């Protein structure tokens, strides 16, 4: 009589991700890692998960409270299922590890951005004397050596090329939560991109907190971001390259020249400036003036007249006057930004700016933010209207969120385009779309042709 065997039930993983694209990338690598080590499958329902992870961001105000609200919602799940594993990762974990373990003692794991590769071992580590497992150290970028090959999810992918930041802007916590700048060896980056391309990825976004500070000298020769982009462009299957997020100080002449020499580099750039006032830029310790910033963008636009620019703005930094804000608005007009991530300044504990006196009334900050965001929306709509009548090359990424009868994709300048089509095999391919209508948050067009016609 043969022995019957019962397969172990598949364990399920739920990850809540807060914050930036680096966190999105890290969360995807956690899924790959625990899928490889524990055969875990992702779920969108936290109530059916065996492992709950929250990947946190500490950039904005109330990040800690957002985390504890999330953990409060999960506490009852832990009470109903004692074997449930709850973990906190990301930048808030790096910054507030002790506070998390004290306020939420039911949390099992606390890990930083540089130690996520140790998750399989942390999950298996039994709690000793009721203590949480904590690993928020900054090992020298070893996590990439311990992660499995990435699994592609569609035609676009993020690829982290460096970690950390060494600029120490007075408002920013990143150097304290992710550590100093460390670049991955170019050969490792190219291997990852090649693997993704073999799975059908057509567009990669090279990531780093200060990505244009990328420097790899592991082979004896220095490879900068411009050279890395050129090497990525040579990989079969890769047709579009983006990079995020940049610092104006590190925007070298070779990187500017890449816009003339590398057609795969898209005609869109996100380059944070934070303020148009030299006085505020100095107080932020940004290391450049407004004129120096504009000069770089004008050089790029001379090489790529159709390029679009987006940026980050902090409103109400301590001491910001009406004149400072007016300088920011003038910069917005001069450049013609068509998108922004703009927020009212919130002091981050442990940063130099947190000690500066803040005497600007809250309502004034809110009014300034509304003025800035309204103008950038107007500029974006003007750019979208100018695109009507153009034929745009669109990378089709899936179905429209609002209409399953339409496919959706993005232009080089990061516009969402929806068009009616009954060819699902077009997903992951490039299509030529005649833009017929500009809507507030997207464009609508008709299909003229695609790679399927070749």
Curated annotation (Swiss-Prot):
SUPFAM superfamilies: Radical SAM enzymes
Stretches assigned to the MTTase N-terminal domain: 11-128
Alphabetical list of InterPro entries matching this protein: Elp3/MiaA/NifB-like_rSAM, Methylthiotransferase, Methylthiotransferase_CS, Methylthiotransferase_N, Methylthiotransferase_N_sf, MiaB_methiolase, rSAM, rSAM_horseshoe
Enzyme Commission code: 2.8.4.3
Protein's UniProt name: tRNA-2-methylthio-N(6)-dimethylallyladenosine synthase
Species the sequence originates in: Saccharophagus degradans (strain 2-40 / ATCC 43961 / DSM 17024)
Catalytic activity: N(6)-dimethylallyladenosine(37) in tRNA + (sulfur carrier)-SH + AH2 + 2 S-adenosyl-L-methionine = 2-methylsulfanyl-N(6)-dimethylallyladenosine(37) in tRNA + (sulfur carrier)-H + 5'-deoxyadenosine + L-methionine + A + S-adenosyl-L-homocysteine + 2 H(+)
Main location: cytoplasm
Sequence ranges assigned to domain Radical SAM core in this UniProt record: 151-382
Annotated compartments: Cytoplasm
TRAM domain boundaries: 385-449
Family as reported in the entry's similarity comment: Belongs to the methylthiotransferase family. MiaB subfamily.
Self-association state and partner proteins as the record states: Monomer.
Any Pfam family hit: Radical_SAM
Cofactor: [4Fe-4S] cluster
